[in-house]
Amino acid sequence: GIMPGIKVDKGGQPLPNSPTELVTGGLDGLKERLKDYADLGACFTKWRGVIAITESIPTNNCINANAHGLARFAALSQEAGLVPIVEPEVLMDGTHTIERCFEVTERTLREVFYQLAQHNVALEGCLLKPNMVLSGASNTKRASAEEVAEKTIACFKRVVPAAVPGIVFLSGGQSDDEATLNLDAINKLGTKIDAPWELSFSYGRGLQQATLKQWSGKSENVTDAQTIFYHRAKLTSAARQG
């Protein structure tokens, strides 16, 4: 069946003294909102923290602030009987290398799990929704799916505890094909090394881009758009199995 959930953060706001970075808002009144959502039948919640990469950022302050917010959200969600989906997203915007993404993703996840522990979050009762370790979108030498899988699994083995039951990847602006191929490679490698977590997906654009383009708001395109969506969903589901 389908379990309903809700995104509860209020988006990114400029980080004080570092206005090119964002910190996620929405903690004020969250405890009361979560009780209302649970009463309405919600089963899970989601909170996204955004980490950008340039030569000079992310700062430790940005990583720490977003990790703290994610942990507060997760603790409050579990207190309300909801499963938190913890989403620290290292953006793929930029020209950075896959090695730079590895470094920033490792730093970010290390702080996230430190903060989750500080807030007594039960890792067995939450899901992690991270980025894959990728080259920057504007890098002319994009890493292959196999390299993405190797770097992603290597990074997570360092910092994601085995107690986390599942990792559900965000697509993060990858093309439909790229998101599918990378997920497939990650699951193949995960199976090979007997990774301790389920490796699945939580895609928005990675499932919808081609569908929305075909539909374009026109009723005569609905059937074709549905066919495209079904095809992409089948491919992504197969990729989740490796």
What kind of region is each of these model predictions?
Residues F44-G49, G81-L91, V121-N131:
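Short beta-strand segments at enzyme active-site cores
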Residues P19-R33, P58-F73, E106-R107:
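Glycine-rich anion/phosphate-binding loops
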Residues G1-G41:
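Active-site cofactor/substrate anionic-group-binding motifs, chiefly glycine-
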Residues G1-G5, L34-A42, A75-E79, Q118-L123, ...:
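Acidic (Asp/Glu)-rich catalytic clusters
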